[in-house]
């Protein structure tokens, strides 16, 4: 009997350990070694220590993810300067967070491309594009990625940029900030598209002990949808730094340039002489503004900024309010600053044909009689008379 019990207990222990053994075998505990410049994941990676990349490599996630153990400390991935790395097609999930927001998941000092990635973390920095002094910085490109950092109460930074970053597309659920500090490289971010659900900022940082930077953080926006604030600003202190008003004296400011996109905040001051229009609290800039106006079938659009030769083609029923400080042209009509113009509807004249069918002749309300320059009321009356005569002629023929 004791032998039977012993065998049963042994089998039970094997049954208990099998899932643990399988789990241990089903994940990597660090990134595999590259082969011919490529790492192709065939299972998830659970990190207990930082991965430092000091080679040119492409990491194909193949739908797998990298995540951390409960005791993990450091960066998930550190790309050292001088190396080119591409990460694509997977998830990076960092469960850590702190109130200071100083924990970083991915840190880049080299050249890093993120493609079709989902990166999420608690309060902190999802991707830091770092620098190594005024002339050496990380270069980052982001394409079709979803990046989230923070919680509903405390937002983190999706991208903290001290180097050169280009965002082509994606969804960003935390701040995207370009930074500058005294003695360091000023961050420069170019945004060509994407959806930004938090703030996009260019920020000048004073560590207090070093003073204000003498170079400008820069953000250039060419397109995208921006649901948070887009602005420049000043910050003081170590992380987390505090926003402060513009300091007095000769202090270098950050730069923001907006050439296109859709915004929930007023970005007119950053648009130069690019077309800016507003409709119900939404601001459209550049080609996006022109598309919004010319595709609209109703509503009121306020032109906030425009070039001297701006000409718009607008559908009937749309009202254009010109607050651009210059005269613009709407459907060949001059609209001075401070005035508005509603594009009139159409008049449809139905003329019976010999076969009993009708032909439709559209005409706008503001069409002029070419001989007199008068409004078309005379023409409409004449057309009605013609319709009556044609109708009578048709009746006579039917008899």
Predicted regions and their residues:
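Sec-dependent signal peptide cleavage junction
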Residues: 17-27, 367-378
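C-terminal low-complexity, Ser/Thr- and acidic/Pro-rich disordered "stalk" regions positioned immediately N-terminal
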Residues: 338-372
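Sec-dependent, cleavable N-terminal signal peptides
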Residues: 1-24, 391, 398-399
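A cross-kingdom C-terminal cell-surface attachment/processing module
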Residues: 376-397
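Acidic Gly/Asp/Thr-rich repetitive segments characteristic of extracellular carbohydrate-active
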Residues: 25-46, 50, 276-304
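Extracellular beta-strand-rich solenoid/capping regions of secreted or surface-exposed proteins
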Residues: 46-58, 66-88, 94-112, 123-135, ...
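Solvent-exposed loop/turn tips at the surfaces of repeat/solenoid architectures
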Residues: 59, 64, 89-90, 95, ...
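All-beta strand scaffolds that present successive hydrophobic residues in beta-strands
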Residues: 59-61, 84-89, 112-116, 140-144, ...
């Amino acid at each position: 009997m004791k032998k039977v019990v012993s065998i049963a207990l042994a089998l039970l222990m094997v049954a208990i350990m099998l899932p643990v053994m399988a789990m241990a075998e089903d994940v990597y505990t660090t990134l595999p070694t590259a082969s011919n410049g490529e790492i192709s994941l065939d299972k998830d990676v659970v990190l207990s220590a930082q991965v430092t990349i000091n080679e040119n490599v492409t990491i194909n996630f193949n739908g797998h993810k990298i995540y951390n153990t409960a005791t993990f400390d450091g960066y998930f991935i550190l790309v050292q300067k001088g190396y080119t790395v591409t990460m694509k097609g997977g998830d990076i999930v960092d469960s850590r967070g702190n109130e200071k927001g100083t924990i970083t998941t991915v840190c880049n000092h080299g050249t890093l491309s993120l493609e079709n990635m989902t990166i999420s973390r608690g309060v902190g920095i999802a991707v830091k594009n770092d620098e190594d002094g005024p002339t050496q910085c990380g270069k980052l490109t982001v394409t079709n990625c979803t990046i989230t950092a923070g919680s509903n109460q405390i937002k983190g930074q999706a991208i903290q940029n001290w180097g050169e970053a280009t965002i082509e597309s994606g969804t960003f659920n935390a701040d995207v900030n370009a930074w500058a500090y005294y003695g360091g490289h000023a961050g420069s971010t170019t945004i060509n598209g994407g959806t930004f659900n938090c703030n996009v900022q260019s920020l000048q940082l004073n560590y207090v002990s070093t003073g204000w930077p003498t170079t400008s953080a820069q953000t250039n926006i060419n397109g995208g949808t921006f649901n948070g604030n887009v602005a420049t600003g000043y910050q003081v202190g170590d992380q987390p730094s505090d926003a402060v008003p513009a300091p007095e004296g000769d202090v270098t400011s950050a730069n923001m340039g907006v050439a296109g996109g859709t915004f929930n905040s007023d970005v007119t001051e950053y648009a130069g002489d690019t077309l800016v229009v507003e409709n119900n609290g939404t601001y459209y800039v550049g080609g996006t503004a022109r598309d919004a106006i010319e595709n609209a079938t109703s509503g009121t659009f306020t032109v906030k900024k425009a070039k001297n030769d701006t000409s718009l083609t607008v559908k009937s029923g749309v009202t254009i309010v010109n607050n651009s400080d210059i005269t613009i042209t709407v459907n060949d009509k001059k609209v001075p600053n401070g005035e508005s113009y509603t594009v009139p509807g159409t008049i449809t004249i139905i003329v019976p044909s010999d076969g009993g069918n009708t032909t439709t002749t559209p005409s706008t309300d503001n069409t002029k009689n070419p001989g007199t320059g008068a409004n078309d009321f005379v023409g409409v009356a004449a057309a009605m008379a013609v319709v009556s005569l044609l109708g009578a002629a048709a009746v006579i023929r039917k008899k």
